[in-house]
Amino acid sequence: MPKRKRTGLSSLGTLITAMSISLMACGAIMSLNSSCDNDSPSFSDDNHTGQTEHFPGLETVTLPEDLYSQIKEYIGFTISFNKDNKTPNYVAWELLGDEVKNDIDRTDNFWTDPDIEGCPSTKDYTRSGYDRGHMCPAADQKWSIEAMNDCFVMANICPQDHKLNAGAWNTLENKERQWAKRDSAIMIIAGPLYSADDTNRIGNAKVRVPGAFFKVLLAPYVEEPRGIAFVYPNMTSPDNMQDYAMSIDELEKITGYDFFPALPDELEKTVESSFSFKEWNNSK
């Protein structure tokens, strides 16, 4: 994932050293994930350079060998694009708590990337009956004009039911921003889900309409790292978030994808094998 320039700690070794000094000042040797006041450590402001600098490769997803994938890194996110579906396989990005406080204006300037094979045009969605649904939402890219512009690339877009886009999916996106502020940073991976029955296509480019959408969340900087996944059908969906929640392992069985293969094995097992919506929704 492209590195965003921030001041502060530049490596995990520096991070450990700085935290060790802080912990010794508390009068006790504590684990890396502890703090003097028993709250989750804060990596915001000048002490957070972005989680992918400390856990390299979190944006990487291992896909089935027979699935076409063209990877491209944009300013604030990474896309795996599928030229057959004319939609992304997935879009991955980190969201820092401080970034959601910024106020770069939304552009709505959708554009076709000539470097992406099969990237559709915004006209392919015109009068299709579907929204141009962002996988990485514009509201997550308000920290940079360039990131905001990149967010409107058509490679980041899928045909999405309007009531889902403006309803339950939007509710989840808003909740993610709250969680990012609370947890200092979260990793997000989102994309469409297709089955053999999903044969509908729109526009001259024949953009394939997905039957559902998935989202994977990881909070690695809390006292007990946690993960969760969601699957929403591409239709009007009741706004009851926990009904769409599942473990990351469950989603991996559905998609055939391997999320967060760069994590240490034990940590990956911990965050992927189970989930607690209550912990995500209520943790302080």
Over which residues does each language-model region extend?
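Domain-level detector for secreted/extracellular nuclease and nuclease-toxin modules, and
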Residues: P2-K284
